[in-house]
Amino acid sequence: MGKIIGIDLGTTNSCVAIMEGNQVKVIENSEGTRTTPSIIAYMDDNEVLVGAPAKRQSVTNPKNTLFAVKRLIGRRFEEKEVQKDIGLMPYSIIKADNGDAWVEGHGEKLMAPPQVSAEAVRKMKKTAEDYLGEPVTEAVITVPAYFNDSQRQATKDAGRIAGLEVKRIINEPTAAALAFGLDKAEKGDRKIAVYDLGGGTFDVSIIEIADVDGEMQFEVLSTNGDTFLGGEDFDQRIIDYIIGEFKKEQGVDLSKDVLALQRLKEAAEKAKIELSSSQQTEINLPYITADASGPKHLNLKITRAKLEALVEDLVERTIEPCRIAIKDAGVKVSDIDDVILVGGQTRMPKVMEKVKEFFGKDPRRDVNPDEAVAVGAAIQGQVLSGDRKDVLLLDVTLSLGIETVGGVMTKMISKNTTIPTKHAQVYSTADDNQGAVTIKVFQGEREMAAGNKLLGEFNLEGIPPAPRGVPQIEVTFDIDANGILHVGAKDKATGKENKITIKANSGLSEAEIDQMIKDAEANAAEDHNVRELADSRNQGDALVHSTKKALTEYGDKLDAGEKEALEASLKSLEEVLKDTSADKAAIDAKVEELGKVSQKLGEKMYADMQAQQAGAAGAAGAAEGAAHAGGAQQAADDVVDAEFKEVKKD
């Protein structure tokens, strides 16, 4: 069996590693570097360049040089973050037939983000094969912890397109924790925070490393993040600043010039890196553009203080997810033993300072932020291949559920539940003789389904006619170790079932998941009111249904006046339920009124039941007397002596 390689498929850079015995090896690519730019260029002669060669020619071929495609993977074209990127990217982002955000490269050719990302994966595969001297067919690929189901599926697809069987998708912070934990000699339980600020995404995870009978157990206690915040956004702030300064000085807007934009991107990234180790840098771009007066040159000094002012709010945005992660993990900041920084952007002094300020301790400097994730993926690959037995990884998921009556989000699996996991619950129909149900699957923290992200839906048909509430439909949520969701629904009476693996085309947008959690906290009162209104409506619907049924069976036992009052109250409740603007108080008042008016009907039903029971008891007494009369003879005739053995069913 060949080795399972570990791939960190990053927004800005990618990296590949393998395990050799118990030693990890981060493999150098054909250009001699241990990280490869996640840049893909499509040339006129159909050649595809990946990494440094693609980056080198980007200035002269901006429309066919694709970068930061990971920000689009598993996303819908309409999402505001995709729309924002359309104005910033020199290449074209197009709406595909299925509504996804695709890219245009190599002339008019449309490509899906997994297809483009597959080129970077293929480069990592080739890098490993060149080093090992044998084919590589299996890999563990990492994703941001806050990637949703469709984004994970799209990443898995990228691996498959590249010719790899993706054995596991694991979260980047978890992979970094694996790399850190196995490299340290400290014994005993430790709680660590992994702060992962990469090129396009931000994650924070609180992870407990425990020594259980010689086995290292990595348990993710909580995770949080922002899937549209990263180094690319820091670069963009510098680009916007340069464009503004140049326009003030020269009166020329560089934002409309794709060639100039590509040069600015390169210069901004270089300046940002230099300002991590020096207080000032100079951006010098001769012949950046030209107008009627001749060529224009760009020369601009930027200080570290200026950069920090430009990105201050971006750095600040990373702190709220840290607070939520600490709270969700049920720990205090003081309980954290180590803070690990992952992602190239964490080299920025301002980021380190902010992390130290929040966690109250210096982050560890002995973890390579560019390589730790790939190293962790390689370790997980060794575990999956059976070559390593002393590591157990317990990762977590986000909240998942289905929409139930009244638009309520009924959670099947709560956030930060350890995966793999499975949960089943029985639901029923909302209407009489309902022949089919639609199962809508959502991801998010809001109480009402509409406030969450729809991942997918499917129908269960062929339910036999029955009154509402009678059919039993078992819905099962099953999340595998990759964090990919499988949902099934089964009618327990007929055995009919339907199931899907959620492959929603959309991906969660910039702070959509993050926003869901914030909204859930900020709008808790509003959500509670909406939930209570839905409950009142459901209660009203149920009362209307049961009252109508009782009227049909026992209405003739009521006086004309009683029946008329009951029907009027029933109609009044039905009208208020039809009124979409009716509030909870109005519905509750009508429910209470109908409850009082229908008491007489209840009394008639109860009296009727008692009469039936009395009649049944009288008939039973008569039968018993007859039995005594012929007792002995009947016993002799009907009873057979026999041995018996009790068989217990499992």
From Swiss-Prot:
**UniProt-listed CDD domains:** ASKHA_NBD_HSP70_DnaK-like
**Molecular functions (GO terms):** ATP binding; ATP-dependent protein folding chaperone; unfolded protein binding
Q: What is the name of this protein? A: Chaperone protein DnaK
Q: Mind listing the UniProt keywords for this protein, alphabetically?
A: ATP-binding, Chaperone, Nucleotide-binding, Phosphoprotein, Stress response
Which family does the similarity line name? Belongs to the heat shock protein 70 family.
Q: What domain of life?
A: Bacteria
List the InterPro entries hit by this protein, alphabetically.
Answer: ATPase_NBD, Chaperone_DnaK, Heat_shock_70_CS, HSP70_C_sf, HSP70_peptide-bd_sf, Hsp_70_fam
Organism listed in the record: Burkholderia cepacia (Pseudomonas cepacia)
Q: What induces it?
A: By stress conditions e.g. heat shock.
